[in-house]
């Protein structure tokens, strides 16, 4: 049974749209936990477009589940992670003009530099996950980097038309099995919604799904606690086939 990590970046997006103090993502993280979140995920981007350094400091002091810090593989971010000591770091690619993370890390092309950062973080007691596309080459490179986890990028599945969704789901199944055969633990996320999450949640071997935008969007109608509860029910009791159409 997969657990649920709730990404609260989009709460900070609303705040930053007006450069004001609300909504504050810190108390919203508590509401997500009260709704059943097994962890809180935030992405501290280099341009600080949503989550701010102070948010991260306060979340570290208040989150009672698990704090997963998504960040670019840069010396600045490694230094912040070593100071904050999140429960996990997920290394992700960043491009300044992107609206959201557009793809997985090219671990195979950056293996040397990534290995140094992975080692530095894990020696400090912070488990590292690499956000990768569901491709064998990237999984093998992730294993060689020394990371203990991967997070499979589910964007291609989430964005596929119904005719291609089964193919993308099969890729995720195969990638999960391959990662586990390499000794990696597996999370997944990106673009998952109330309509498409169940088939991914049913994949044997995926330990946690990280989901944000759809939960925050749903919370406008029903409140954050209920939005998290609804998603948690789908993640914990999934149908075995994707809902097409």
Swiss-Prot record:
The record marks 151 as: Transition state stabilizer. GO terms for molecular function: pyridoxine 5'-phosphate synthase activity. 1-deoxy-D-xylulose 5-phosphate binds at residues 9-10, 45, 50, 100. It is found in: Cytoplasm. The active site is at residues 43, 70, 190. Transmembrane segments: none annotated. Its EC number is 2.6.99.2. This is Pyridoxine 5'-phosphate synthase. It comes from Prochlorococcus marinus (strain MIT 9303). The lineage of its organism: Bacteria, Bacillati, Cyanobacteriota, Cyanophyceae, Synechococcales. The gene is pdxJ.
């Amino acid at each position: 049974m997969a657990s649920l990590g709730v990404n609260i970046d989009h709460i900070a997006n609303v705040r930053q749209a007006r450069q004001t103090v609300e909504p504050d993502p810190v108390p919203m993280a508590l509401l997500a936990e009260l709704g059943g979140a097994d962890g809180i995920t935030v992405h501290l981007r280099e341009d600080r477009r949503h989550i701010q350094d102070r948010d991260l400091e306060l979340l570290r002091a208040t989150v009672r589940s698990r704090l997963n810090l998504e960040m670019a593989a840069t010396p600045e971010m490694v230094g912040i992670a070593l100071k904050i000591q999140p429960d996990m770091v997920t290394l992700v690619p960043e491009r300044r003009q992107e609206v959201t993370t557009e793809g997985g890390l090219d671990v195979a092309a950056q293996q040397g530099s990534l290995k140094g950062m992975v080692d530095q973080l894990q020696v400090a007691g912070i488990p590292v996950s690499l956000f990768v596309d569901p491709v064998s080459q990237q999984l093998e490179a992730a294993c060689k980097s020394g990371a203990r986890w991967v997070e499979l990028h589910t964007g291609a599945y989430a964005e596929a038309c119904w005719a291609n969704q089964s193919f993308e789901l099969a890729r995720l199944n195969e990638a999960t099995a391959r990662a586990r055969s390499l000794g990696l633990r597996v999370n997944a996320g990106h673009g998952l919604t109330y309509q498409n999450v169940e088939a991914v949640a049913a994949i044997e071997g995926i330990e946690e799904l990280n989901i944000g935008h759809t939960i925050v969007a749903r919370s406008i109608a029903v409140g954050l606690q209920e939005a998290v509860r609804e998603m948690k029910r789908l993640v914990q009791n999934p149908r075995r086939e994707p809902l097409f159409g």
